[in-house]
Amino acid sequence: MKIAILNDTHAGIRNSSEIFINYQERFYDEVFFPYLLENDIKQILHLGDYYDNRKFINFKALNRNRHHFLSKLREYGISMDIIPGNHDTFYKNTNDLNSLKELLGHYMNEVHIVMEPKVVTYDDLDVALIPWICAENYQKTMNFIKECKAPVCGAHLELAGFEVARGQACHDGMDHKIFNKFELVLSGHFHCASQRDNIRYLGSQMEFFWSDADDPKYFHVLDSSTREVTAVKNPLRLFERIKYDDTKNEYFDYDVTQLKNKFVKVVVANKTDPFTFDRLIDRIQNEDVHELKIQENFSEFIGENVVDENISLEDTATLLDTYVEAVDTELDKKKIKSQMRELMREAQALEIS
C-alpha cells in the first residue's frame, strides 16, 4: 500500500491572497492528484497545518479549498487521516478547539481527524500518529511514546536544532532523542526539509515566503511494505531570485517569460552597464509579475562604522536575532528570538491580500 503524505498546506495563507489560492489549486490540479490517480493511491496522511490562520479563515479560501481539494477526495474515492498542527488549533495550550473539527465535518466519510496519539495500520505497517504536542496532551503523549510499538511515527513536531528555514535553526523545542525508539519519524511544521538520525522533516509542498525560494519542494509517498519514502517534486515555482552580475553574465537574451505570475527579486552583485540593467528590469515588468523587488549591493557602505560585516541584508530573521543578542537583558533570549520570529511570520502572512 502506498500513502501520499502532505503537511503544512496552509489553506488561506498570506491573508487568503488570490495569488496563493490559485497557486495551491495548480499544485493539486496539475501535480498532486494526477500523481495519485496515475499510481492508484487511495490514502493520504496529512501531518498538520491544513489551515493557516488559527483564529479564522476567509470564506473565499474555504470555498476554493473545498473545490480543489476536499471535493476531489470524494470524487476520486480517496481517504485522508489528519492530525492537527499548531496552525489548526485556536489555543496554544490545548488542541481541543481546532479548525479541523469545525470545518471538515461535511467530509467525515473521507477525512479522519486524529485528535489523540494513536496507532493507525496501513496494510501491514503500524504508524504512530502524534498531534501537535501542547501543555494539555504532553504527558499523555510521553506515555504513548513509551508504550508504542509502531516502527514509524507521523507527527507535527517542534524539535530543537533542526532548521526552521535554510540557515535558521530552531533554538528551543523538544529533544529529538525522545523519539529514538522509532525507526523513522516523519514530521511537518518546519517548511524546509532536513534529516538527522531517524528524524525526517518533510518540508512544505509549496512556496509561501521568500525563504522558500531556491528550496525544492516535494510531497512524499510512503510504501507500507518497504517503508521507503519517495519524494515527488513540485515543479511549480512562485518565488524567483535573480542574481545580477553583468561582469559574468549576459542579459540581453535572458528568458523573462518564466517570471510571469511570480514574485521576483533581482539581487545586484555587479552593475557596470546601467542600460543593460534597466532594459532587463523593463522586460521583467512587462511580464505581469506579482511583485518585483530590486536589492542593490550596499557593500561599499559596510566599513568600520558597522559592527558586523557578515549580516545579510536580505535575511530579516538574522537581523532580528542579532538585535536580540545585542540587547542587555536578563530575559531568556532564546524565547525572545522565538517570539520575534513568530511575529515576523504573522506579519508576513498579513502582507498580501
Task: Label the model's feature ranges.
Residues 2, 9, 13-119, 178-182:
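Core catalytic region of metal-dependent phosphoesterases/phosphodiesterases
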Residues 2-3, 43, 125-126, 152, ...:
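Structural motif
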Residues 8, 28, 44, 49, ...:
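Divalent metal-coordination and catalytic microenvironments
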Residues 10-14, 52-55, 81-94, 120, ...:
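Active-site environment of divalent metal-dependent phosphoester hydrolases
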Residues 73-76, 144-148, 176-181, 257-260:
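Short, conserved loop/helix-junction motifs that constitute active-site signature segments
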Residues 88-177:
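Conserved catalytic scaffold of divalent metal-dependent phosphoesterases
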Residues 165-230:
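Conserved beta-sheet core of the metallophosphoesterase superfamily
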Residues 224-353:
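Accessory, non-catalytic peripheral segments of nucleic-acid enzymes
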